[in-house]
Every structure is written in structure tokens, then in C-alpha cells.
From Swiss-Prot:
Binding site for Mg(2+) 3: Q820, E832
Region (Oligomerization domain): 402-546
Residues annotated for Mg(2+) 2 binding in this entry: E298, N300
The protein's enzyme class: ligase
Subunit structure, interactors included: Composed of two chains; the small (or glutamine) chain promotes the hydrolysis of glutamine to ammonia, which is used by the large (or ammonia) chain to synthesize carbamoyl phosphate. Tetramer of heterodimers (alpha,beta)4.
Protein's UniProt name: Carbamoyl phosphate synthase large chain
Upper classification of the organism: Bacteria, Bacillati, Bacillota, Bacilli, Lactobacillales
Gene from which the chain derives: carB
Functional summary from the UniProt entry: Large subunit of the glutamine-dependent carbamoyl phosphate synthetase (CPSase). CPSase catalyzes the formation of carbamoyl phosphate from the ammonia moiety of glutamine, carbonate, and phosphate donated by ATP, constituting the first step of 2 biosynthetic pathways, one leading to arginine and/or urea and the other to pyrimidine nucleotides.
Length: 1060
């Protein structure tokens, strides 16, 4: 059937901010879908709240709205735009749930708007646990014995009937949010309560646990003519019981027989047909290892994390095809954009092994619960491709960027056998490294399989890697063995370690012996048809499929996996850099390892190398491609860390030189720059050991801000108040960055702001200044930022502009640079300079309508800023007020403190824009999911230093109608100021009233700042944890509370008695 002619305008719903469970994969799928619809001639309107995405660029849709993804705001857009249809299936769970809510309000019927792709009945049947169970029974597809519960009592009744353990799965949530495995009544009550709170329909499924079964996924597509295909099948390394987003995943399936694959394939196709889904769908199965018995776990009736992985694993662009199917095209009418010869109805074939490894945030949350279960905890993922499972797995390990190039944590060698066995039994984020350690101790496959419940096939592969390590250690400089281990994915650095050499010597040895990687194409058809996809992976075989182009090229290093501190913002900058390189007439080459992102869509760059971002892998690509140079400033710290080793080996780094990068990053060199320019800077110093650090702090006076050099996202950064705290910090954190000293600054209290500038070495352009709402001491990535500044005098703005221009010129910056300031006593103090793209680049690009990364790239390639139409200085403010607000994923992680400080904790961001600050703040809070009641009870418990300021805020909360509850110390301060307040007992008095009131919804807002007294901080931690667990809005900064008051005051009408 040809595409539909009766619809012309389509609204696409995006997925909002990046949170655990819903990451950059939806920017990739959303961008693909919008472009596919425009390709077919439709007018596309996009709504999304996340400014850090390519999807929200003006060229992706005909009109782009960066607005909160709520019924209130999207209804307003629908009434204004009057689209013919909505495509809700590429915005993840957020998009699906919003479509359901819009339908329930009646606005779609009122305006005659239809849902494309997947009908509401199908969404309901797949997402509503009871309807899904009924459908599966009707299809004779087995599901685990289960019951629907709408309250804790119902959940307990079913568990009592079938016995523990049970799995709890909330309805209409993603990433396993609110779910878990309960082994007893106490765990059941906790998990069920959380799941019911987080389910938008207050419903959970309680099912018999099938933990231990193999977990297998099928990505399927169907069109309106009922043609259906399997795009990809995937097998989880971890058995059922660990969320698939947290498991290592292999494609295609590795341990299934042909009969098992056909059985599950038939079931997946039967299910997608029964649901009448038009587009993409993900079906998850649990398969018994010892029989053909299986269960259907769940169905995602939309584009998902797994479909992004399947797209990159096969080269088959699922979201693009799904969008075309949604407007009526059939699979046999859509050309496969990879081969350009076959049709979309041909199922992809793989002649390689793909490994996906999750990236966890526990480097940021050292006290977090690392146990893995049915609720997802990973922030991002990496993918690697190889000809053998071992090669694919080892490439994936070194893509993770966790300080390892091989599955070996030296510290694990010190564990006792008992400790090691305990870690293998319990699924956690480092289980792969524990398993490898077990084989280094000669555990048998049977012993490890018994402890871990892992499939012996996968354990055998890990054991093989350990056996090859031993072979290398026993046969130093054996060239035949060198060729063999390279085929199995060993890094030069690991070989060098085992041979007592430097990695460069191993590399030289390989080159002399012609042991070189070749590059194979990802072509969807295992080489059956000719293909010209410029999408490659390395392996050690004889023939290569990638040939150097005659055209001069530039290599851009991507930013690797999404993690806290290095998010999708850097992928945004990478993609824009590629566009500018192409505009300048060069061939653009990307190297990256992240399957979720737009940058690894094969249609973006002229060539894509899906490879680990290590020195060895980058040099291999450079050897083949011989680019004019390498751009590192858009890939975050991942790329910046490669600059010096590349330059040392004669590779040209384009943009700011390595020497100047070091002058900005090295504390002593940077201090010299600041002093030479006579710029104000907090007093500080550097130390390489504990004694030196204590001496520096003593000299400049406490409190001090301490951090390692060369880090991103405030890694291991803390405010320290005395010598004891500093002593503890050095013991914990100085080893974070072995080769660089610890930096110590006097901590100034004041307003913080930042600026991104672009320079060509002469002209320096400041597109805008962003004022932070939270004062200095909270990481810039966790602060709300306002453009243009609202409280700065012209003198302060002039100081910031002047200092930024001087710094840029003195550091010979070419490209982008980010500078952060504290405003203290009327002076702008420079606190940090980052000579690269920062996480604010997408936000500033959107609000100023200047594509910063493109302008910067053209400057790097030699097109002066004057030729691009810019002069030195701060550009005039654009219309409107724009607020960038952080979004956190605390509810997904146990035992993680939500108190904000100098180390970054947010996973994503949203933007609110309007004509006044209060309105823009309201939108930002709504977009971030912080829905504020206009009245209720606010619990305020603050440290002594904050009491005066908290008292002023408390008065304003009373004015807008809030009742106040406070612990004794805070309550006394309020009563002294004549404020009505109820006193509540502290937790250390043995009373749990505070936690009970939060749990029972008797508190609507919590404001909690922490004292340095560890006993009080433990109270504070428990209060914050309770607020997050029960979905109560929580502020850990009085500045954020002040911003919330602006919103509440905007909504409140004033009431007062008339004067007598």
C-alpha cells in the first residue's frame, strides 16, 4: 500500500530527559523517525523537553517545541498546531504514557487526531499487566503464574499462595522502574509499595520467579499488510532476574539450537500479529536451559533500548522503518538504505558477534547498592563487534572506560576464596571481572556455573581468555601466539604487560610482522549482496573492506558511553562537528563505541568506525585513513585524554594545541596564566601527598574545595571543612588520578556562572552567559542555569567578558572553551577553564540560535570567525528567558545520597522557556517531573549555618499557604521569627515520625541541608532517601527552594483582610 495521503501534519513526541532506563537511544530513534517522515513529504512537528538532543535541532522537524512533556503543555501545542496524527512510539515509555493520557482526556477525539503505528488497544494490551496476561493465555503462549495487585495486601495474598521468591513488575513503567525480586514478606511490602507508587495506573504484576532461565530477546517488525520479520535476536549473559539493560548482551543468540530459535521466532511473530502492532516491537522470553519450556516475560510495543542496539548490531534502521510503516508503507515497498538493493522485508543476517556491555554510575556513587536485579541501574552502554565472541567481548571491555583494557581488576586478586565466591553468587556490576578472577585461581567451569548460575558456554569463553593470558606469560615474544591472541581481541597493552614490554613495542612488533587489523563492513546481509555502507569494525583477518578515500579527511573522536558527567551533550557536539567538516569539503570520519547515539548512525558521517576509544584502536584507524588531523574537543574527557598520547606519536591535533590544553588543565601552569593576566582567582595550591595537602589547606584556610586534576563531572570533588575531613578525603580519592596532583582551593561563597566561547586564535565570541541558581559548591552540571543572567550588573558582565577574552587569547584557544566564575564581593573570580566543548553547548546553541560546535569546527579548519560574520565580544541577548534544569535518577539507585555538592549526580537535563523567569522556572520544574502542589506541609530541616536564610524562605512558604514542619533546632529559629511551625522529633531521638509522615504522604515538600556532623548527616541521608523513595519533591539547596517559591508565588493570588 502506498503511503497515506489523508494525513499531512504529524506530531512526534520525544522522550524527555535522560534518566536511568531511558537514555540517548531515543534521541537516535526520534531523529531517524522525524527525518524519515519528512523524506516522505509529511510536515513534522516535534515536542520534547530535552535541549541536549539532535532531535530538537530546528532542521530535524518543520517546527520544534522544547516544552514539558505533560498533558497541559502538549494539549496546548495540539490546539495550536492541529496535527492530523501523533506518532507516540519513538518517545520511549514517556511518549507512550503521554499518548494514553491525552487520549483519556478526550482531546484526540475532540480535535480528530489519530495515533499512528501502534493503536491504543495494543499499547494497553502490552503495557497493562492483566490485559497482557489474558492475551497470552488466549494465544496459548506461556506466561509465569501471576496475579495483578492494586495494593500491598493483594500482592501479599498471591505471594503467600505460591511461595517466595516472587518478581514484582509495575505497569506502564520503563527500565524495570519500581520492580524487583522479593524473597520474603518484608521485601515484598517495600518493593510493592514502591512499584505501586511509580506505576501511573497504581498496578503491579506479582509473578512466580523464573530467575535462572536464559533471557532471550527478539526485535520484530510488522506492517499493515501483516508482513512480519525478525530483525535481530539477542541473548543475555545474565539469566532472568537481572534487567536486560544491566546485562551483557550478545547478538545473534549464542547458545540456542535452531529448534529453539525457530520456536521463539514463531512465538514473537505470533505476538506482534495478535497485538496488531504496526512498526517495531521487542519481545522478551525466558527459556529453560534443560528443556524446550519457555515463558513470555514482556513486550515493548515501541522502539526501545534494545531496538537501538539491534539497529546498530545489524545496520537495519528500525526507527526509520517503523516511522515509514506508521504512515502506511509496507515492508516490501521500503528500500533497505544499507544495501540500497534489497527491500526492508529481508531479514538481516550477521557474520560476526556483537557484545553490549552496560556502563554503571558507581564510580560516582561509591556507597550505592551494586546488586543487580529487575530494576535497571546502568546509565549507558557500549557495543563492540568481532569475529569471535572473545574478540567482541574484550573490545567491549576496553570500550567501557572504567580504567581497564582487560577483564582484570588487580584488587580482586587480594580477595579470599570465600569473598570471591560471594561476589560470584550475587549479580553485580563487576561480575565479569570476578568470574575471570575465579578462572585465574583454577576454579572449574562446573564450580563457577554452580555458583553463578551462568551458562557454561559463556564461562568457557571467559576461561579461554584466561588461558590465553597464561600462554602469553609463558611464551614471551612468540609471534605466532601474538597473531592468535590478536584474533581473540587482546589489546597491545595487555600483551605488553604480560611480556614486560611497552605497548608501543608490541605495536611495532605487530607492524613488522604484518599482524594488522582489517576493517569489515556492517551490511545487514552477511556479504550476500553488494553494499556501500560506510560502517566498519576491526578484526584480525586477511582482507579489508575499508579503503582510504582520495578526498582529504578529518577524524572526530566521539565520547563513548553515556555516564554521569559525560552525557548526550557531547554526542550532540560531535554530530555538529561532523556536519561542519562536511560543509568545509572534507570527508568526516567518526570513531565511537556507543550504540545509543546519533553519532553512530551510519548515515551521519562519511565513515563510521565502531571501535573502542583507546590509543591502540584510534592509531589503527589513523594508519589506514591518514586523516589531515584529529578533532578531540567535542568528545568530552574521553577524547581530550587521547590528545597528548596521539600528539606524542606525531598525529596532528586540530584546534587548541596539546601544550595549551595542558596549560588549562595543569594547576601550576594555569595559575601562572591567571597571575600573568592579573585575574582574580580563589587562593589555592597543589599537592601530591597528604602532608602537602594539609599544609596547603592550613595556609589558605578552611573550608577548601579539593579535587584531582584532569577530571570531568566533578569526579571525586569535595568541600572539606577541617583537617580530619581532608585526611579522610586524601585516603579515599588521591588515587583517582595517579599521574596528577590534587588541587586545593579556598571555597568562596557566591553566585556561580559559566560562559562558552568560540575563538579562532584572534576573534573571541561569547554567545551568552549562563547564571546558576544554586550558589558555588554545587557542580555546574547539577545547577539550574538561566540565560540571560537575571541578577548581574553590567560591571560583572563586563568583567566576565573581559576575563574570558583574555583567557582565550592567552591559552591560544582555537575552537570552543568553557569558563566558570564565582561572583564574590563584586568581583568575578575564575574557578575553572575547560578548553573544549562543555555540556552547556546544546542548551546555549538552542537559546542563541547559533550552532556553537559547527562555528567552532569551521574555525578549527581555518575559516575565521570574521569570515563567518562574528566580531570579538559578548553577543546581544536573545529574546525570552530560558532555564536549564538538571534531572536525577536517584529513585533507581539504592543507598545513594541525593545531597548535591561539587561532584555531579544528574543524568540528564530539561529546558523551560518563557517571557518571565517565574514562568520559565515553572516549565523547567514540570519538565523535570517535579510537580509542586500549591499548598500542603513542607518539612524543613537545615544545618545551623542555613537557619537565617531558611527562616526568610519559611515566611514566604507560609505566605503561599504551606504549613511548616521542622526539627527542634530549625523550629526554634522559625518561632523566634514569629513563624507558625509544628515541631517533629529528630530521628536520633529514636522516633521515626518524620519517615512515617513522608511515607504516608503527610509531607508534600522536603527541604533538607546537611551538617558536617556525621550523626546528623545520617539523619539527613535517611530523610532524603525517604523523600525519593516516596516521590516527595526534595530540595537540598536553599537556592533551589527559592526558585520554587518564585513559581508558587506566581501561581498564588494575594489574599489579605481589608484594613479597619
Amino acid at each position: 500500500m502506498p503511503k497515506r495521503q489523508d494525513i499531512h501534519k504529524i506530531l512526534v513526541i520525544g522522550s524527555g530527559p535522560i534518566i536511568i532506563g531511558q537514555a540517548a537511544e531515543f534521541d537516535y530513534s526520534g531523529t531517524q523517525a522525524c527525518l524519515a517522515l519528512r523524506e516522505e513529504g509529511y510536515e513534522v512537528v516535534l515536542v520534547n523537553s530535552n535541549p541536549a538532543t539532535i532531535m530538537t535541532d530546528t532542521e530535524i522537524a518543520d517546527r520544534v517545541y522544547i516544552e514539558p512533556l505533560t498533558v497541559e503543555f502538549v494539549s496546548q501545542i495540539l490546539r495550536k498546531e492541529l496535527p492530523d496524527a501523533i506518532l507516540p512510539t519513538i518517545g520511549g515509555q514517556i511518549g507512550l504514557n503521554l499518548a494514553m493520557k491525552l487520549s483519556n482526556t478526550g482531546i484526540l477525539d475532540e480535535l480528530g487526531i489519530e495515533l499512528l503505528g501502534t493503536k491504543l488497544t495494543a499499547i494497553d494490551q502490552a503495557e497493562d499487566r492483566e490485559l497482557f496476561k489474558n492475551l497470552m493465555q488466549k494465544l496459548h503462549e506461556p506466561v509465569p503464574e501471576s496475579a495483578i495487585a492494586n495494593n500491598i495486601e493483594e500482592a501479599q495474598q498471591f505471594a503467600d499462595k505460591i511461595g517466595f521468591p516472587v518478581i514484582i513488575r509495575p505497569a506502564f513503567t520503563m527500565g524495570g522502574t519500581g520492580g524487583g525480586i522479593a524473597n520474603n514478606e518484608k521485601e515484598l511490602a517495600e518493593i510493592a509499595e514502591n512499584g505501586l507508587n511509580l506505576s501511573p495506573v497504581t498496578q503491579v504484576l506479582v509473578e512466580r520467579s523464573i530467575a535462572g532461565y536464559k533471557e532471550v530477546e527478539f526485535e520484530v517488525m510488522r506492517d499493515a499488510a501483516d508482513s512480519a520479520i525478525v530483525v535481530c535476536n539477542m541473548e543475555n549473559f545474565d539469566p532472568v532476574g537481572v534487567h536486560t539493560g544491566d546485562s551483557m548482551v550478545f547478538a545473534p543468540t549464542q547458545t540456542l539450537t535452531d529448534k529453539e530459535v525457530q520456536m521463539l521466532r514463531d512465538a514473537a511473530l505470533k505476538i506482534i500479529r495478535a497485538l496488531k502492532i504496526e512498526g517495531g516491537c521487542n519481545v522478551q522470553f525466558a527459556l529453560d536451559r534443560n528443556s524446550f519450556k519457555y515463558y513470555v516475560i514482556e513486550v515493548n510495543p515501541r522502539v526501545s533500548r534494545s531496538s537501538a542496539l539491534a539497529s546498530k548490531a545489524t545496520g537495519y534502521p528500525i526507527a526509520k522503518m517503523a516511522a515509514k510503516i506508521a504512515v502506511g508503507l509496507h515492508l516490501d515497498e521500503i528500500k533497505n538504505p544499507v544495501t540500497k538493493k534489497t527491500w526492508a522485508e529481508f531479514e538481516p543476517a550477521l557474520d560476526y558477534v556483537v557484545t553490549k556491555l552496560p556502563r554503571f554510575p558507581f564510580d560516582k556513587f561509591e556507597n550505592g547498592d551494586r546488586t543487580l536485579g529487575t530494576q535497571m541501574k546502568a546509565t549507558g552502554e557500549v557495543m563492540a563487534i568481532g569475529r569471535t565472541l572473545e574478540e567482541s567481548l574484550l573490545k567491549a571491555v576496553r570500550s567501557l572506560e572504567v580504567g581497564l583494557i582487560h577483564p582484570e581488576r588487580p584488587a580482586f586478586a587480594k580477595l579470599s576464596d570465600d569473598e570471591l565466591s560471594k561476589q560470584i553468587i550475587q549479580a553485580n556490576d563487576e561480575r565479569l571481572f570476578y568470574l575471570a578472577e575465579a578462572f585465574r585461581r583454577d576454579y572449574t567451569i562446573e564450580e563457577v556455573a554452580e555458583l553463578s548460575k551462568m551458562n557454561p558456554f559463556f564461562l568457557d569463553k571467559i576461561k579461554h581468555i584466561v588461558e590465553l593470558e597464561r600462554e602469553l606469560a609463558a611464551h614471551k615474544a612468540d609471534l605466532g601466539l601474538l597473531a592468535e591472541v590478536k584474533r581473540y581481541g587482546f589489546a597491545d597493552e595487555e600483551i605488553a604487560k604480560l611480556w614486560g614490554l611497552h605497548a608501543d613495542q608490541v605495536r611495532q612488533m605487530r607492524k613488522e610482522q604484518k599482524i594488522l587489523p582489517v576493517y569489515k563492513m556492517v551490511d545487514t546481509c552477511a556479504g550476500e549482496f553488494a553494499s556501500d555502507t560506510p560502517y566498519y569494525y576491526s578484526t584480525y583477518e586477511s582482507s579489508t573492506e575499508s579503503v582510504k578515500s582520495d578526498k582529504p579527511s578529518v577524524l572526530v573522536i566521539g565520547s563513548g558511553p553515556i555516564r554521569i558527567g559525560q552525557g548526550v551533550e557531547f554526542d550532540y557536539a560531535t554530530v555538529h562537528s561532523v556536519k561542519a567538516i562536511q560543509k568545509a569539503g572534507y570527508e568526516a570520519i567518526i570513531m565511537n563505541s556507543n550504540p545509543e547515539t546519533v553519532s553512530t548512525d551510519f548515515s551521519i558521517a562519511d565513515k563510521l568506525y565502531f571501535e573502542p576509544l583507546t590509543l591502540e584502536d584510534v592509531l589503527n584507524v589513523i594508519d589506514l585513513e591518514q586523516p589531515e588531523g584529529v578533532i578531540v574537543q567535542f568528545g568530552g574527557q574521553t577524547a581530550i585524554n587521547l590528545a597528548e598520547p596521539l600528539a606524542n606519536r606525531g598525529i596532528k591535533i586540530l584546534g587548541t594545541s596539546v601544550e595549551d590544553l595542558n596549560r588549562a588543565e595543569d594547576r601550576d601552569l594555569f595559575d601562572q596564566v591567571i597571575k600573568s593576566l592579573k585575574l582574580p582567582q580563589p587562593e589555592g595550591g597543589t599537592a601530591t601527598d597528604k602532608a602537602g595537602a594539609l599544609a596547603v589547606a592550613d595556609k589558605i584556610g578552611y573550608p577548601v574545595l579539593v579535587r584531582p586534576s584532569y577530571v570531568l563531572g566533578g569526579r571525586a570533588m569535595e568541600i572539606v571543612h577541617d583537617a580530619t575531613e581532608l585526611d579522610n578525603y586524601i585516603d579515599r580519592a588521591v588515587s583517582v588520578s595517579h599521574d596528577h596532583p590534587v588541587l586545593i582551593d579556598h571555597y568562596l561563597v557566591g553566585k556561580e556562572c559559566e560562559v562558552d566561547c568560540i575563538s579562532d586564535g584572534d576573534t573571541v565570541v561569547l554567545p551568552g552567559i549562563m547564571e546558576h541558581i544554586e550558589r558555588a559548591g554545587i557542580h555546574s552540571g547539577d545547577s539550574m542555569a538561566v540565560y540571560p543572567p537575571q541578577t548581574f550588573s553590567q560591571d560583572i558582565i563586563d568583567q566576565i567578558t573581559d576575563a574570558t577574552i583574555k583567557l582565550s587569547r592567552t591559552l591560544n584557544c582555537i575552537g570552543l572553551m568553557n569558563v566558570q566564575f564565582i561572583i564574590h564581593d563584586g568581583k568575578a573570580y575564575v574557578i575553572e577553564v575547560n578548553p573544549r566543548a562543555s555540556r552547556t553547548v546544546p542548551f546555549l546553541s538552542k537559546v542563541t540560535n547559533i550552532k556553537l560546535a559547527q562555528v567552532a569546527t569551521l574555525a578549527i579548519l581555518g575559516l575565521s570567525l570574521k569570515e563567518q560574520g562574528f566580531e570579538t565580544g559578548l553577543l546581544p541577548n536573545q529574546s525570552g528567558i530560558h532555564v536549564k534544569s538538571p534531572v536525577f535518577s536517584f529513585s533507581k539507585l539504592n543507598h545513594v545520597d541525593s545531597l548535591l555538592g561539587p561532584e555531579m549526580k544528574s543524568t540528564g537535563e530539561v529546558m523551560g522557556s518563557d517571557t518571565t523567569l517565574a514562568k520559565a522556572l515553572y516549565k523547567a520544574f514540570e519538565a523535570a517531573g517535579m510537580h509542586l502542589p500549591q499548598f500542603g506541609r513542607a518539612l524543613i530541616t537545615v544545618k545551623d549555618a542555613d537557619k537565617a536564610e531558611a527562616t526568610a524562605l519559611a515566611k514566604r512558604f507560609r505566605e503561599v499557604g504551606y504549613q511548616l514542619v521542622a526539627t527542634s533546632g530549625t523550629a526554634k529559629a522559625f518561632e523566634k521569627a514569629g513563624i507558625t511551625v509544628s515541631t517533629i522529633e529528630k530521628l536520633d531521638s529514636g522516633q521515626e515520625t518524620i519517615l512515617e509522615d513522608i511515607a504516608n504522604r503527610k509531607i508534600q515538600l522536603v527541604i533538607n541541608t546537611m551538617s558536617a556532623d556525621k550523626k546528623v548527616s545520617s539523619d539527613g541521608f535517611r530523610i532524603r532517601e525517604a523523600a525519593i523513595e516516596h516521590g516527595v519533591p526534595l530540595m537540598t539547596s536553599l537556592d533551589t527552594a527559592g526558585a520554587i517559591l518564585k513559581v508558587l508565588e506566581l501561581q498564588a493570588f494575594s489574599i489579605s483582610p481589608i484594613k479597619s
